[in-house]
């Protein structure tokens, strides 16, 4: 689908899908991830230089083009992922939604999922629906093996 602008024929800028809720945007994000569909993935993201993406064990990527390139590289690997979401906590307001969750990812034909990935997704309500601003995914810490009599350790 192409966008028409006043006084011209058609422009080459494709019209992005509209996501009426942050949950709709999130569902589209994970569907695109499982299908390794770059165009569908980037429909979810805000076209903004302030977007941020951190893949597990990876650097902080800021800006639409670096984020797009990172997904292109991931999808080019040919590995197909199946993602099961758990431990979801959703904080939402009129203009911003924050989703904290665990991604339980199974790669290719593996029988068991990999260790969970702790993820935070941030969405903003725009004139064209909800769009992703931040995707931060980090490996979940492994539960430490405690010696008998060891109490819990509090970081802060």
Segments predicted by a language model, with ranges:
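A beta-strand edge to alpha-helix "cap/lid" segment located at domain peripheries
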Residues: 4-43, 50-156
